[in-house]
Amino acid sequence: VVYTWKDEKSGGTRISDPEKAKQIAEKAKRYPLVLQNVEKKKKQKEAPLLYDLTELQRDASARFGYSAKQTLNLMQSLYETHKVLTYPRTDSRYLTKDIVPTLKERLDAVSIGPYKALAQQAKRSPLNGKLSFVNDAKVSDHHAIIPTEQYVQLSALSNEERRIYDLVVRRFLAVLLPPCVYEETVIRASIEKECFTARGKRMVEKGWQEAYEDNRYDEEDEAKEEVREQNLPLLEAGMKIGQPKISLREGKTKPPAHFTEGTLLSAMENPVRYMENRDSSLVKTIGEAGGLGTVATRADIIEKLFRSFLLEKKGNEIYLTSKARQLLKLVPADLKKPELTASWEMQLNDIAKGKKRRDVFMEEIRSYSVELNDEIKTEEGTF
């Protein structure tokens, strides 16, 4: 069993003082580890929500290295040509109530090959109490991406199309399967007043996770550094473990990772963390507006930046070109901030509510554009 040291005051698992770390390691060599508390809880986890376009683009980028534009094109083909998936340019991850009666037909349509057993299981599973993915209020123009009632011929799809189709079908099946049920064990131990923790998990019922061959959607806890998930033997409070092996792991603070297309899409959808001004009205407005761009335009925006040689890819990571760095030096600071989009959206909302006149807003934009132009002309840099 791997136990991780934990600061009782802060809850952190890192020690910045090397001497203190060595002192704790010395204690572990001289004193036993005593189990203070062993707590077991049965938990359940619902399936992830259905796909909207952005979430699908993120997954396709992470799994297959597909660009946002490539995923959109593949989705468009599956929608228009093969007619096996629903409308792709949606920003909703929910279904409307009128779709519920069609779910059985859609399950019949995907009840082939690798999906047959799962589809049959989903049909046997009662829908009562698990329609959390049905919410009319969270669907504006188009519902989440799901299979149509059209029977699919997998042999008619290209390899790339099959990959996208597979993502959508498995997600669709997952929301119709029972929750995943597991038993979580949390152990709190000590070595001479130093706190150590361990956490383990035992699967009780796989539920919706049967729709996935890997445990991609069971990573929430594993992503936390303060504990490690592991299979645990039978342990009880009061047990002593004599002279446990101890290891010190030295680490360094890493700079922020470069964007991939998937993480860039996430940042465009929710740019709040990149805002210097966290004014609540600005944050609320940009959230309601759906971030920078729309679900239908983000792929084209990213593609245009590549075509204009402002961005370049090295592997899956995105880098600025020298041309982009030149441009960013010339552009006034306000024009590079998400706050500007939020401010304009607020004013457009005021126009829609009759609180502001359209011609006044347009005149302000014209004046602002002239000021920007003059400011850029006086800059010393060139582009």
Give residue spans per PLM region.
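Conserved phosphate-chemistry cores used by DNA topoisomerases
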Residues: 1-84, 89, 98, 156, ...
